[in-house]
């Protein structure tokens, strides 16, 4: 088990910022293998204003985005760019996306991603999001990394 990664460290690993950062903390990871992170879902999320008034539910595509961000963190922890550069991961594909449980304010989404394969700049991962012990969402995700100047 590695030490946890807080939001300030996450900001060094992902380009996302409010209101689109969907990972609050990494609680465990092993480079080139897996990462476990959390997203605390609160009523203050801007998407709850319209999805849905009086019945707030986290959109499924944002659960997938949270998984994709967790994948980006794992990939960036697993590979070092050239001096003065950083990797930006583009969402390149998704397969087998399934939604099993609604996510509402007050839930803590546990994001578990596992590296399924990596070839050159392409990263394939499997992700699962849980509320407690209930599977909320799962998918196979593909990203393409591009090395860009800082």
UniProtKB/Swiss-Prot annotation:
GO biological process, one term: lipid A biosynthetic process
UniProt keyword terms in alphabetical order: Cytoplasm, Lipid A biosynthesis, Lipid biosynthesis, Lipid metabolism, Lyase
Active site annotation, chain numbering: 51
Catalytic activity reported: a (3R)-hydroxyacyl-[ACP] = a (2E)-enoyl-[ACP] + H2O
EC class (word): lyase
Compartments, as annotated in UniProt: Cytoplasm
InterPro entries per record: FabA_FabZ, FabZ, HotDog_dom_sf
Cellular compartments per GO CC: cytoplasm; membrane
Enzyme Commission code: 4.2.1.59
GO molecular function: (3R)-hydroxyacyl-[acyl-carrier-protein] dehydratase activity
Pfam family, one: FabA
HAMAP family in alphabetical order: FabZ
NCBIfam families xref list: fabZ, PRK00006.1
Family per record: Belongs to the thioester dehydratase family. FabZ subfamily.
Protein name as catalogued: 3-hydroxyacyl-[acyl-carrier-protein] dehydratase FabZ
Source species of the chain: Legionella pneumophila (strain Corby)
């Amino acid at each position: 088990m590695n030490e946890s990664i807080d939001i300030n460290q996450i900001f060094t690993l992902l380009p996302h910022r409010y209101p689109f950062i969907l990972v609050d903390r990494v609680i465990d990871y092993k480079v080139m293998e897996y990462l476990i992170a959390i997203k605390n879902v609160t009523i203050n999320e801007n998407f709850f204003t319209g999805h849905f008034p009086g019945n707030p539910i986290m959109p499924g595509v944002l659960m997938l985005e949270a998984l994709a961000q967790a994948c980006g963190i794992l990939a960036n922890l697993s590979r070092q760019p050239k001096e003065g550069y950083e990797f930006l991961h583009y969402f390149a594909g998704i397969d087998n996306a399934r939604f099993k449980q609604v996510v509402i304010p007050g839930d803590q989404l546990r994001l578990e991603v596992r590296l399924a394969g990596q070839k050159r700049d392409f990263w394939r991962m499997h992700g699962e999001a849980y509320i407690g012990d209930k599977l909320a969402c799962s998918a196979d995700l593909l990203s393409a990394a591009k090395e860009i100047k800082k």
